[in-house]
Amino acid sequence: MKHIATLLFSLALFSVAANADDKPIDFQQLPSSAKTFIKSEFPMESISFIMKDSDLLDTTYDVHFASGLKIEFGSNGEWKEISRTSSPVEIRFVPKQIVSTVSSRWPGAEFKKIERYRHGYEVELTNRLELKFDKKFRLTEIDD
């Protein structure tokens, strides 16, 4: 019985892995709201490449820019994550309440990454802290 369960689990895992598909795409293949966001918020940025990641449950789009900026969009075209490798993320994308909490508790820290989830936000700071906030922008977790 254990062997059958192990076999079924292995087949299910293989099936999920086989359905995962990362492929490069053109700008025109992005959802329209993602294209609009990029054109309005980052008109001077040069796109290096775009990857479409399709799996069993979701599709995401990773847009990589020459400057080190990376934006991940969900299947609906709304941004899910904004990060930069060489400079801070612009605070205009970070809710004011989160900016206020960070600037009062960690003066001088800047944002390297912001992720937006259904249940809240996660930010990574230049001082290497990772912070989680709930929907009401309350700090719920600190990871150093």
Mark where each language-model region is:
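Interaction-mediating elements
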Residues: 21-144
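Bacterial Sec-dependent N-terminal signal peptides
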Residues: 1-24, 38
